[in-house]
Amino acid sequence: MKEYQTITEISGPLVYAEVDEAIGYDEIVEIETAQGETLRGQVLESSEGVVAIQVFEGTSGIDQNASVRFLGETMKMPVTEDLLGRVLDGSGRPIDDGPEIVPEERQDIVGAAINPYSREYPEEFIETGVSAIDGMNTLVRGQKLPIFSSSGQPHSQLAMQIARQASVPEEEEGGDDEEGSEFAVIFGAMGITAEEANEFMQDFERTGALERSVVFMNLADDPAVERTVTPRMVLTTAEYLAFEKDYHVLVILTDMTNYCEALREIGAAREEVPGRRGYPGYMYTDLAQLYERAGRIQGRDGSVTQIPILTMPGDDDTHPIPDLTGYITEGQIYVDPDLNSQGLQPPINVLPSLSRLMDDGIGEGLTREDHADVKDQMFAAYAEGEDLRDLVNIVGREALSELDNKYLDFADDFESEFVDQGFDQNRSIEETLEIGWDLLSMLPKDALNRIDEEFIEKYYREDDSDRQVVEAAD
């Protein structure tokens, strides 16, 4: 380990120092200020005898008299099963006044995407307890399914609800042994306010969800540079629990927009040529390095499933952050401002939402035999009702047919009964599908052209008058 006092420039979160030896990319650095404070950093660039160092705690207090020590290793996360139930800062240090963490091993936080040949296709259902997700845009183990929201929307409450309620259904008889069925949540918060952090922690502690969770907290007043480390700490912990301890791990990352803003800040400090809207040209690659760490590996019981949450600036889904995220991930869940203004909780708009892996994770033996048909029919009926709402504004409801009016009623009830369940209600997939059939039974049988006749006969609810006629005939 060699020590230098050769700082030449300080720019934003970056420190530049001259060196006379080869320094590795991502190497960990300690900087000791004149006041005796020790700060941690990481090498971003090394060329022609000068290295650029990003300082996690910020560059305040650093001057040209500060000492720079290169430790000769990359940043590692100390991992152990005992991390469950702990709260850490964005750099992986405990902040919950708990006992010192004794790691079983230390793993490089950079990690690597899973070898495509070794990947196992995601096919098993994860129950979030949220009908708009479980019923219409099902999440499966090993998937990466982002939530697209905008500033001021209740995505934090939705994140807490999923973290609190998410579970892996019991294996079917004859399925895998139960050792691989343990479930854990790794929650990574980046750039959130102290108020949001308090809400998260109160909810975790009130509901007991903290016992099966690891929480990483990077606050808004923490250094932006730390935000580039937090998701890698989160995913390294998730990979350890999934692939070495056989947990099914759900990773929730919020807010990825703050992460990308940190990338832009560092890029500006390095005077890089900017890409779209000032973001670095390598942002797509950087995001892919994070998102592609989700998945399953052949021969391993565990899995890593990701739900990254991002706020779309200006509610614009063509903004570089949601746009690039959409290219990499397998669908999206939309939090809709209009539905939120109507008081729906959670305000998920199912029409633009999509889970590309849903069809492989539902059906007999996974959720229920009629799930796919119910989902398709509800999508079609709700879309028809939405179109008719626009028409009603022009011609009035009296000009519509009886069937059209039923579609309008279906759309209203779909939002009020299916989507609007509140942030504290946990619905099983059975309850979700039963509510779906209650709604579809508002429509005549001959309108259910996307559902198999066998399922209609088994699940369709006759109205009261029809039941009375049948009972009288009996």
Curated annotation (Swiss-Prot):
Alphabetized Gene3D superfamilies for the sequence? 3.40.50.12240
The alphabetical list of record keywords is: ATP synthesis, Cell membrane, Hydrogen ion transport, Ion transport, Membrane, Transport
- Cite a single GO BP annotation: proton motive force-driven plasma membrane ATP synthesis
A GO molecular function term, named singly, is: proton-transporting ATP synthase activity, rotational mechanism
InterPro entries in the cross-refs: ATP-synt_VA_C, ATPase_a/bsu_AS, ATPase_F1/V1/A1_a/bsu_N, ATPase_F1/V1/A1_a/bsu_nucl-bd, P-loop_NTPase, V-ATPase_su_B/beta
CDD domains in alphabetical order: ATP-synt_V_A-type_beta_C, ATP-synt_V_A-type_beta_N, V_A-ATPase_B
What the entry lists under NCBIfam families is as follows: PRK04196.1
Which protein family is it in?
Belongs to the ATPase alpha/beta chains family.
The UniProt entry, under HAMAP family, shows: ATP_synth_B_arch
Its biological function?
A: Component of the A-type ATP synthase that produces ATP from ADP in the presence of a proton gradient across the membrane. The B chain is a regulatory subunit.
What is this protein identified as?
A-type ATP synthase subunit B
